[in-house]
Protein backbone atom coordinates (compact mmCIF):
# COMPACT_ATOMS: atom_id res chain seq x y z
CA UNK A 1 0.00 0.00 0.00
CA UNK A 2 2.83 2.42 0.92
CA UNK A 3 4.51 1.51 -2.36
CA UNK A 4 1.35 2.45 -4.26
CA UNK A 5 1.11 5.84 -2.48
CA UNK A 6 4.75 6.61 -3.22
CA UNK A 7 4.31 5.77 -6.86
CA UNK A 8 1.16 7.93 -7.10
CA UNK A 9 2.88 10.95 -5.52
CA UNK A 10 5.85 10.57 -7.87
CA UNK A 11 3.48 10.46 -10.83
CA UNK A 12 1.81 13.72 -9.72
CA UNK A 13 5.18 15.43 -9.34
CA UNK A 14 6.22 14.42 -12.85
CA UNK A 15 2.90 15.60 -14.27
CA UNK A 16 3.25 18.93 -12.41
CA UNK A 17 6.74 19.49 -13.80
CA UNK A 18 5.51 18.73 -17.31
CA UNK A 19 2.67 21.22 -17.00
CA UNK A 20 4.96 24.05 -15.87
CA UNK A 21 7.54 23.75 -18.66
CA UNK A 22 8.81 27.07 -20.00
CA UNK A 23 6.71 27.88 -23.09
CA UNK A 24 9.70 29.57 -24.74
CA UNK A 25 11.64 26.30 -24.60
CA UNK A 26 8.67 24.54 -26.19
CA UNK A 27 8.63 27.01 -29.05
CA UNK A 28 12.29 26.28 -29.74
CA UNK A 29 11.70 22.55 -29.83
CA UNK A 30 8.68 22.88 -32.10
CA UNK A 31 10.17 25.53 -34.36
CA UNK A 32 9.25 24.69 -37.94
CA UNK A 33 12.12 23.90 -40.27
CA UNK A 34 12.15 26.30 -43.20
CA UNK A 35 12.85 25.38 -46.81
CA UNK A 36 14.69 27.96 -48.88
CA UNK A 37 14.57 26.28 -52.30
CA UNK A 38 12.63 23.31 -53.65
CA UNK A 39 13.53 21.28 -56.73
CA UNK A 40 11.00 18.84 -58.15
CA UNK A 41 12.13 16.52 -60.92
CA UNK A 42 11.20 13.39 -62.79
CA UNK A 43 11.55 11.44 -66.02
CA UNK A 44 9.98 8.81 -68.25
CA UNK A 45 6.68 10.40 -69.20
CA UNK A 46 4.62 8.77 -71.94
CA UNK A 47 2.42 11.40 -73.56
CA UNK A 48 -0.20 8.79 -74.49
CA UNK A 49 -0.74 7.71 -70.87
CA UNK A 50 -2.45 9.41 -67.95
CA UNK A 51 -0.32 12.02 -66.17
CA UNK A 52 -1.48 11.44 -62.57
CA UNK A 53 1.31 13.12 -60.62
CA UNK A 54 1.16 16.84 -61.48
CA UNK A 55 -1.31 17.77 -58.70
CA UNK A 56 0.89 15.99 -56.14
CA UNK A 57 4.05 17.62 -57.48
CA UNK A 58 2.42 21.04 -57.25
CA UNK A 59 1.58 20.49 -53.56
CA UNK A 60 5.31 20.62 -52.81
CA UNK A 61 5.45 24.23 -54.08
CA UNK A 62 8.61 23.67 -56.14
CA UNK A 63 10.78 26.62 -57.09
CA UNK A 64 11.62 24.83 -60.34
CA UNK A 65 10.72 21.63 -62.16
CA UNK A 66 13.48 19.70 -63.95
CA UNK A 67 12.80 17.17 -66.67
CA UNK A 68 15.39 14.40 -66.37
CA UNK A 69 14.72 13.00 -69.84
CA UNK A 70 12.13 10.98 -71.78
CA UNK A 71 9.67 13.85 -71.63
CA UNK A 72 7.82 12.06 -74.41
CA UNK A 73 8.24 8.72 -76.15
CA UNK A 74 8.90 9.46 -79.80
CA UNK A 75 11.53 7.14 -81.25
CA UNK A 76 11.38 8.26 -84.86
CA UNK A 77 13.08 9.86 -87.85
CA UNK A 78 9.83 11.70 -88.65
CA UNK A 79 10.10 15.19 -87.19
CA UNK A 80 6.43 16.00 -87.81
CA UNK A 81 5.48 12.98 -85.72
CA UNK A 82 7.93 14.06 -83.00
CA UNK A 83 6.42 17.55 -82.94
CA UNK A 84 2.93 16.06 -82.58
CA UNK A 85 4.03 14.04 -79.56
CA UNK A 86 5.53 17.07 -77.85
CA UNK A 87 2.34 19.02 -78.51
CA UNK A 88 0.27 16.19 -77.07
CA UNK A 89 2.19 16.53 -73.80
CA UNK A 90 1.85 20.31 -73.85
CA UNK A 91 -1.90 19.89 -74.26
CA UNK A 92 -2.21 17.79 -71.11
CA UNK A 93 -4.44 19.91 -68.86
CA UNK A 94 -2.67 19.21 -65.56
CA UNK A 95 0.77 19.74 -67.06
CA UNK A 96 -0.31 22.95 -68.80
CA UNK A 97 -1.69 24.32 -65.53
CA UNK A 98 1.50 23.34 -63.71
CA UNK A 99 3.77 25.14 -66.17
CA UNK A 100 1.88 28.39 -65.64
CA UNK A 101 3.00 28.37 -61.99
CA UNK A 102 6.45 26.74 -62.02
CA UNK A 103 9.57 27.37 -64.09
CA UNK A 104 10.50 24.34 -66.20
CA UNK A 105 14.02 23.24 -67.17
CA UNK A 106 15.17 19.98 -68.64
CA UNK A 107 17.40 17.70 -70.63
CA UNK A 108 16.55 14.78 -72.86
CA UNK A 109 17.18 11.04 -72.84
CA UNK A 110 16.90 8.52 -75.65
CA UNK A 111 13.14 8.45 -76.27
CA UNK A 112 12.71 12.21 -76.67
CA UNK A 113 16.08 12.36 -78.43
CA UNK A 114 14.51 10.08 -81.03
CA UNK A 115 16.45 6.79 -80.88
CA UNK A 116 16.28 4.07 -78.24
CA UNK A 117 19.67 3.88 -76.48
CA UNK A 118 20.82 6.35 -79.12
CA UNK A 119 23.90 8.53 -79.23
CA UNK A 120 26.05 10.40 -81.72
CA UNK A 121 24.93 8.15 -84.59
CA UNK A 122 21.33 9.48 -84.67
CA UNK A 123 21.06 11.38 -87.95
CA UNK A 124 18.14 13.60 -86.90
CA UNK A 125 19.67 14.93 -83.69
CA UNK A 126 20.01 18.54 -84.89
CA UNK A 127 16.37 18.71 -85.95
CA UNK A 128 15.23 16.92 -82.80
CA UNK A 129 17.14 19.45 -80.69
CA UNK A 130 15.05 22.33 -82.06
CA UNK A 131 11.81 20.50 -81.29
CA UNK A 132 13.01 19.76 -77.77
CA UNK A 133 13.84 23.44 -77.23
CA UNK A 134 10.47 24.42 -78.69
CA UNK A 135 8.77 22.23 -76.10
CA UNK A 136 10.65 24.01 -73.31
CA UNK A 137 9.73 27.41 -74.82
CA UNK A 138 13.40 28.32 -75.22
CA UNK A 139 13.81 31.68 -76.95
CA UNK A 140 14.88 31.70 -80.59
CA UNK A 141 17.96 33.77 -79.73
CA UNK A 142 19.07 31.47 -76.90
CA UNK A 143 22.59 30.05 -77.26
CA UNK A 144 21.19 26.51 -77.22
CA UNK A 145 19.55 27.18 -80.58
CA UNK A 146 22.98 27.43 -82.24
CA UNK A 147 25.11 24.99 -80.25
CA UNK A 148 25.29 21.25 -80.76
CA UNK A 149 23.57 19.56 -77.82
CA UNK A 150 21.05 20.73 -75.22
CA UNK A 151 23.46 21.17 -72.29
CA UNK A 152 22.77 24.28 -70.23
CA UNK A 153 23.46 25.90 -66.85
CA UNK A 154 21.59 28.44 -64.76
CA UNK A 155 22.22 30.03 -61.36
CA UNK A 156 19.48 30.76 -58.82
CA UNK A 157 20.21 33.28 -56.06
CA UNK A 158 18.15 33.02 -52.89
CA UNK A 159 18.82 34.23 -49.35
CA UNK A 160 22.43 35.13 -50.19
CA UNK A 161 23.10 31.64 -51.54
CA UNK A 162 23.45 30.36 -55.09
CA UNK A 163 22.16 27.07 -56.44
CA UNK A 164 23.57 26.16 -59.85
CA UNK A 165 21.66 23.81 -62.14
CA UNK A 166 23.85 22.04 -64.71
CA UNK A 167 21.94 20.10 -67.36
CA UNK A 168 24.09 17.57 -69.21
CA UNK A 169 23.42 16.10 -72.64
CA UNK A 170 24.35 12.41 -72.50
CA UNK A 171 23.02 11.72 -76.02
CA UNK A 172 24.28 14.10 -78.68
CA UNK A 173 27.98 13.20 -78.39
CA UNK A 174 27.87 9.80 -76.73
CA UNK A 175 29.80 7.22 -78.70
CA UNK A 176 29.10 3.51 -79.06
CA UNK A 177 28.44 1.20 -76.13
CA UNK A 178 29.55 -2.44 -75.93
CA UNK A 179 26.80 -5.03 -76.26
CA UNK A 180 26.98 -7.92 -73.80
CA UNK A 181 26.55 -11.21 -75.67
CA UNK A 182 27.72 -13.37 -72.79
CA UNK A 183 25.03 -12.65 -70.19
CA UNK A 184 21.43 -11.48 -70.14
CA UNK A 185 22.56 -7.90 -69.64
CA UNK A 186 22.19 -5.44 -72.51
CA UNK A 187 25.58 -3.73 -72.18
CA UNK A 188 28.95 -4.28 -70.55
CA UNK A 189 31.66 -1.69 -69.83
CA UNK A 190 33.75 -0.45 -72.74
CA UNK A 191 37.49 -1.11 -72.56
CA UNK A 192 38.95 1.57 -70.30
CA UNK A 193 39.54 4.79 -72.22
CA UNK A 194 37.28 3.88 -75.14
CA UNK A 195 34.42 6.25 -75.94
CA UNK A 196 33.01 9.51 -74.62
CA UNK A 197 29.84 10.30 -72.73
CA UNK A 198 29.78 14.06 -73.25
CA UNK A 199 32.18 14.85 -76.08
CA UNK A 200 35.18 17.18 -75.88
CA UNK A 201 33.27 20.46 -76.25
CA UNK A 202 30.75 19.64 -73.54
CA UNK A 203 33.48 18.39 -71.20
CA UNK A 204 35.32 21.71 -71.55
CA UNK A 205 32.08 23.59 -70.90
CA UNK A 206 31.37 21.50 -67.80
CA UNK A 207 34.91 22.07 -66.53
CA UNK A 208 34.43 25.83 -66.87
CA UNK A 209 31.03 25.78 -65.17
CA UNK A 210 32.38 23.87 -62.16
CA UNK A 211 35.66 25.77 -61.84
CA UNK A 212 33.89 29.13 -61.93
CA UNK A 213 30.93 28.12 -59.80
CA UNK A 214 30.23 30.25 -56.75
CA UNK A 215 27.24 28.13 -55.82
CA UNK A 216 26.64 26.58 -52.42
CA UNK A 217 25.12 23.62 -54.28
CA UNK A 218 25.83 22.38 -57.80
CA UNK A 219 23.01 20.22 -59.16
CA UNK A 220 24.18 18.10 -62.09
CA UNK A 221 21.39 16.55 -64.15
CA UNK A 222 22.34 13.41 -66.08
CA UNK A 223 19.60 11.55 -67.91
CA UNK A 224 21.27 8.21 -67.07
CA UNK A 225 22.50 6.93 -63.72
CA UNK A 226 25.99 7.84 -62.57
CA UNK A 227 26.58 5.63 -59.52
CA UNK A 228 24.47 2.52 -60.10
CA UNK A 229 26.48 0.54 -62.63
CA UNK A 230 25.82 -3.18 -62.24
CA UNK A 231 22.44 -3.56 -63.93
CA UNK A 232 23.62 -3.81 -67.54
CA UNK A 233 21.44 -1.04 -68.94
CA UNK A 234 22.64 2.44 -69.84
CA UNK A 235 24.82 3.97 -67.13
CA UNK A 236 27.99 6.01 -66.84
CA UNK A 237 29.67 2.79 -65.66
CA UNK A 238 29.60 1.57 -69.28
CA UNK A 239 32.45 4.06 -69.76
CA UNK A 240 34.44 3.67 -66.53
CA UNK A 241 37.07 6.22 -67.59
CA UNK A 242 34.31 8.82 -67.90
CA UNK A 243 33.19 8.06 -64.34
CA UNK A 244 36.75 8.70 -63.17
CA UNK A 245 36.92 11.85 -65.26
CA UNK A 246 33.83 13.39 -63.64
CA UNK A 247 34.87 12.38 -60.13
CA UNK A 248 38.33 13.88 -60.68
CA UNK A 249 36.78 17.05 -62.10
CA UNK A 250 34.58 17.44 -59.04
CA UNK A 251 37.68 17.19 -56.87
CA UNK A 252 39.94 19.48 -58.89
CA UNK A 253 37.35 22.15 -59.66
CA UNK A 254 36.65 23.05 -56.05
CA UNK A 255 32.93 23.16 -56.79
CA UNK A 256 30.88 22.77 -53.63
CA UNK A 257 28.30 20.14 -52.83
CA UNK A 258 27.53 18.51 -56.16
CA UNK A 259 24.36 16.42 -56.29
CA UNK A 260 23.54 14.31 -59.35
CA UNK A 261 19.95 13.86 -60.54
CA UNK A 262 19.19 11.04 -62.98
CA UNK A 263 16.31 9.15 -64.57
CA UNK A 264 15.86 6.55 -67.35
CA UNK A 265 15.36 3.40 -65.29
CA UNK A 266 11.61 3.34 -64.54
CA UNK A 267 12.57 2.95 -60.88
CA UNK A 268 13.56 5.52 -58.27
CA UNK A 269 16.39 5.23 -55.77
CA UNK A 270 19.04 7.22 -53.93
CA UNK A 271 22.71 6.22 -54.16
CA UNK A 272 25.69 7.62 -52.24
CA UNK A 273 29.45 7.29 -52.65
CA UNK A 274 32.34 8.60 -50.57
CA UNK A 275 35.24 9.72 -52.78
CA UNK A 276 38.79 10.16 -51.49
CA UNK A 277 39.80 13.79 -51.76
CA UNK A 278 36.24 15.12 -51.98
CA UNK A 279 34.89 16.98 -48.95
CA UNK A 280 31.34 15.72 -49.41
CA UNK A 281 29.74 12.47 -50.62
CA UNK A 282 28.37 12.16 -54.14
CA UNK A 283 24.65 11.45 -54.19
CA UNK A 284 22.92 10.20 -57.33
CA UNK A 285 19.18 10.71 -56.88
CA UNK A 286 17.27 8.74 -59.54
CA UNK A 287 13.62 9.56 -60.21
CA UNK A 288 11.79 7.59 -62.90
CA UNK A 289 8.86 7.10 -64.11
CA UNK A 290 6.10 9.62 -64.06
CA UNK A 291 3.50 7.75 -66.13
CA UNK A 292 4.75 4.16 -65.97
CA UNK A 293 7.25 2.20 -63.93
CA UNK A 294 9.01 -1.14 -63.63
CA UNK A 295 6.18 -2.63 -61.57
CA UNK A 296 7.59 -6.18 -61.88
CA UNK A 297 10.97 -5.12 -60.49
CA UNK A 298 12.50 -8.05 -58.60
CA UNK A 299 15.71 -6.39 -57.47
CA UNK A 300 19.22 -5.66 -58.71
CA UNK A 301 22.60 -5.02 -57.17
CA UNK A 302 23.67 -1.45 -56.39
CA UNK A 303 26.43 -1.19 -53.79
CA UNK A 304 25.79 2.52 -53.34
CA UNK A 305 22.03 2.33 -52.68
CA UNK A 306 20.46 3.99 -49.65
CA UNK A 307 17.10 2.64 -48.52
CA UNK A 308 14.85 0.84 -50.96
CA UNK A 309 14.08 0.92 -54.66
CA UNK A 310 10.69 2.44 -55.52
CA UNK A 311 9.10 0.73 -58.52
CA UNK A 312 5.85 2.70 -58.48
CA UNK A 313 5.11 5.86 -60.42
CA UNK A 314 7.02 8.60 -58.63
CA UNK A 315 8.77 11.97 -58.67
CA UNK A 316 11.68 13.45 -56.74
CA UNK A 317 11.80 16.41 -54.34
CA UNK A 318 14.86 18.18 -52.92
CA UNK A 319 14.27 20.58 -50.02
CA UNK A 320 17.21 22.93 -49.34
CA UNK A 321 17.59 24.42 -45.86
CA UNK A 322 20.38 27.01 -45.78
CA UNK A 323 20.14 27.50 -42.02
CA UNK A 324 20.94 23.87 -41.25
CA UNK A 325 22.98 23.22 -44.43
CA UNK A 326 20.85 20.19 -45.21
CA UNK A 327 19.16 18.82 -48.30
CA UNK A 328 16.22 16.50 -47.73
CA UNK A 329 15.51 14.23 -50.69
CA UNK A 330 12.13 12.56 -51.05
CA UNK A 331 10.73 10.00 -53.46
CA UNK A 332 7.00 10.66 -53.69
CA UNK A 333 3.97 9.35 -55.53
CA UNK A 334 0.26 9.95 -56.04
CA UNK A 335 -1.46 11.97 -53.31
CA UNK A 336 2.03 13.17 -52.32
CA UNK A 337 2.73 9.93 -50.44
CA UNK A 338 6.36 9.60 -49.34
CA UNK A 339 8.05 6.33 -50.35
CA UNK A 340 11.64 7.11 -49.34
CA UNK A 341 13.42 10.04 -47.72
CA UNK A 342 17.04 10.89 -46.97
CA UNK A 343 18.65 13.99 -45.46
CA UNK A 344 22.26 14.87 -46.23
CA UNK A 345 24.23 17.37 -44.14
CA UNK A 346 26.65 19.65 -46.00
CA UNK A 347 29.27 22.19 -44.95
Task: Pin down the residues of each PLM region.
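Bacterial Sec-dependent N-terminal signal peptides
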Residues: 1-27
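Long, structured stretches of catalytic cores involved in phosphate-ester chemistry, encompassing
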Residues: 1, 27-347
Amino acid sequence: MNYFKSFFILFLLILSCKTNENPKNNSLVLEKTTTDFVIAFGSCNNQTLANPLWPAIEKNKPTIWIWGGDIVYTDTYDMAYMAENYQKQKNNADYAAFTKKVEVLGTWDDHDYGLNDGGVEYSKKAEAQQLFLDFLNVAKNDARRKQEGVYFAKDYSVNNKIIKIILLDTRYFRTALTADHETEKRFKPNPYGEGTMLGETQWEWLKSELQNSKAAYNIIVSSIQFLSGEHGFETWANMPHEVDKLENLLKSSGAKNAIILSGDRHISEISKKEIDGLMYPIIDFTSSGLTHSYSDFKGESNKYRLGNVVSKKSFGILNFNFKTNTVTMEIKGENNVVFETYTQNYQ
